[in-house]
Amino acid sequence: MATTQNYGTGRRKTASARVFLRPGKGDIVVNGKPLDAYFGRETSRMVVRQPLEVAQAGNRFDVFATTAGGGANGQAGAIRLGIARALVEYDETLRGSMRAAGFMTRDAREVERKKVGLRKARRATQFSKR
């Protein structure tokens, strides 16, 4: 018996997530742990749930996500994008509401590299006129 599932990939900063959406009762599992156990901060958990709330599908799907790289916020953003893409794969009519909420756009901001001669990416040493 083959179970139907939808797949979405998400990336944010240096984090990447593979998200599988299956019909269920609303369980969210990240790297084998429940959502509340994996993310300590409530804001990260809220970010992950946002696409399901917009689609009003909070308790219709089980979400299985594997993430790698980055920190907690980057991984949460990557999972959010993956869930949104999987929901659109499941129901194409959700694309408009997902785009309006900003969940279909990959956040392209990356860390700027440190330059030689500067203390950080843009921070120079203090300038002394005399």
Swiss-Prot record:
A Pfam family per the record: Ribosomal_S9
GO biological process, one term: translation
Claim: Ribonucleoprotein is one of the keywords in the record: yes
GO molecular function: RNA binding; structural constituent of ribosome
GO cellular component labels: cytosolic small ribosomal subunit
Family: Belongs to the universal ribosomal protein uS9 family.
Record-annotated disulphide pairs: none
Gene: rpsI
InterPro entries in the record: Ribosomal_Su5_D2-typ_SF (IPR020568), Ribosomal_uS9 (IPR000754), Ribosomal_uS9_bac/plastid (IPR023035), Ribosomal_uS9_CS (IPR020574), Ribsml_uS5_D2-typ_fold_subgr (IPR014721)
Keyword Ribosomal protein appears in the UniProt entry: yes
Protein name: Small ribosomal subunit protein uS9
Keywords annotated in UniProt: Ribonucleoprotein, Ribosomal protein
